[in-house]
Amino acid sequence: MRRYLQQGRGKLVGHRGRQGALVGFAATVLYLLTMDRSVSWWDCGEFIATGHLLQVGHPPGAPLYQLLQHLFTLFSFGNPMLVAPLSNALSAVAAGITVGILYLTMRELRVSWRGALVGAACYALCDTVWFSAVESEVYALAMLFCAADVWLMLRWRRTGDARMLPLVGLMLGLGVCTHLMTLLVIPALGLIYLSGRRMARTKPYVFIFAFFFFFIGLTPYAIIPIRAAADPPINEMRGSFESYLKREQYAKAPLYPRMWRERDREHWREWTFSDHGLAANAAYYITYQLGFMYGRYLMYNFIGRENEHWNIVVLYILPALLALWGLARHRRRSRWDFWIVMALFLMGGIILNLYLNHPCYEPRSRDYVYVLSLYALAVWIGIGADEVGGKWKTVILIAAPLTLLAGNWSDHDRSRCHSVHDIALNHLQSCDRNAVLITLGDNDTFPLWYLQQVERRRTDVEVYNVGLTGWSETMDIIASNMGHRPVYFSQYFVDRYADYFPGRLRCEGFCWRLVSTAGEAGDLEPMRRHIRDSIEWHITPHEYLPRVSRNFLRDWEQNTASIK
């Protein structure tokens, strides 16, 4: 037994480690080749701007991610056009390392190298993972810490090396400084400890060190109040540091009722038979929250989805069949290992879904929050690949990742995607000099922050997001600037609040100008001028257009349809 425990002690890089490094390197190359070369939608523009200049982003913050972003973007050497690619490269590298660690984790779970390779490849090529790996978001780095924690605990179980536990504590703390989803691995870590406590005996003081290193891992959070005190241009810490960490500016969803957001009442009946009562809430949870907001995402990744660009239905059900076969066979292999992987799957999926209590409807897909459950499914894919027999085994194992690669390549290769950058720039270009631009959501705000803060484009335009400044303060800003400076609204703002300004909105390019009279609103010359002189586009053949880009361009076409 002692010889088994000491097997591989102190050797973090052996033959198996080199295999994992090769798998991780291949995944990293794939992500670097297909990553976005500029800003992307949603939080990416905010993360690039706050990371590059060490500003304060939305609660509860991601200080370690921002510090690493800042480190990566230092290699731009003052070239602002390299900042976004370098920031995106952080996600690509983190996701690639995660794939390598997944391979090593499956080897620790006694999966053959062939099965581990198939499982790691299917994880690397699935929709959600690939999407997060090619843009500036926190989830790739957060999954790296989740994967590292599980792998290190499994190494501790096999080798009995007490040094692994403080390292697990450190990784857990650093993961919290990236995203709180890292805490979801704690039940699995506990099961690994219970399964190995008799073979890998550890003295009590080691656990004290592990807790100490966990708190050391939390120290990057100190940068949030320090930078907030410097009052940078982007500072989303309102009030105290405690309220920032608690995300008090956001609405909190209760565990019950499941139908809780009153403004969604008209949509509840689409998913259940009533808008109140325990039975109706249970039906809503099963149909919408568990089915539409979780089960649908699992099928997107391992069964199939409609390709958003070419409008072709591509089915790749083979990975899902391997996962189901691996799930069925895993418990026969090892009861402890089965429940360890099941803990990852449940905590990263069903239990997380229960906690989040998704409102009806979300403004965007939320598949990225369930990436830990996809990680667990990838382990079962590897085990399923191990258990496949017969003369078709080689064909099946090769076909599983290849179908994912073929199905996902077209809408995950963002190396030629410039639509986000161009649409954001055209918002700024649609404004006259020294204008005030009022925006509403993430997609008409964060890419503009990136352009102004990083590329220093149209810094004369002041951008105010009504969700951050508040309605009352926004009205004060409009009133104080009207007649002195041009005031513009984004399309998102106009869609929701146009009724507050009847007859006073004139379309100019991608924005709407607030004018004094209805007569001015009917003047089409400013629109023609912007189309002729201000609007800029990259001419990129075969560029993939994300759904948000298509929606913006659809609105643009509708606004310009009357101008010939």
Predicted feature locations:
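N-terminal membrane topogenic signal
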Residues: 8-22
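Transmembrane-helix signature of polytopic, membrane-embedded enzymes
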Residues: 17-20, 102-125, 334-343, 347, ...
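Extracytoplasmic catalytic/substrate-binding loops of multi-pass membrane glycan-assembly enzymes
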Residues: 35-47, 57-69, 290, 415-419
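Membrane-interface interhelical loops and short amphipathic "cap" helices
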Residues: 41-50, 76-82, 128, 356-366, ...
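Short hydrophobic/aromatic helix or loop-helix immediately within or flanking a transmembrane segment
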Residues: 50-80, 92-93, 293-302
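Loop-to-helix entry region of an early transmembrane alpha helix in multi-pass inner-membrane enzymes
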Residues: 63, 67, 77-100, 132, ...
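Transmembrane-helix motifs of polytopic, lipid-linked glycan transferases
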Residues: 89-110, 148-152, 321-326
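ER/secretory pathway lumenal C-terminal domains and tails of membrane proteins involved
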Residues: 92, 135-136, 140-143, 155-163, ...
